[in-house]
Amino acid sequence: MSVAELPIAIDREKIAVFCRARGIRKLSLFGSVLRDDFDPQRSDVDVLAEFAPGVRPGLRFFGYGEELAEIVGHKVDFNTEAWLSQYFRDEVVREALPIYEQA
């Protein structure tokens, strides 16, 4: 799937501004938003963030999902690879669709 085929609108410029301001070097989508079972009325958007080396977001991390929700218009479940369960981490990383990558 490509970003153009997603069932939600992604403003890549707003996403880029969000990521640059927070030291995120890669932001990807995973989960139901990439599959046919995504329900725009009920589903949240699963996001996987990779921070640049040395970036430590601290407690601000917990507000990033709400900030992204305002950009994408859906509730966001904000994650890093370390926060994902070891039982499905590898699968998530394999299926993730990047929507921002630091140049």
Per-region residue spans from a language model:
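Short, aliphatic-rich beta-strand segments
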Residues: 46-49
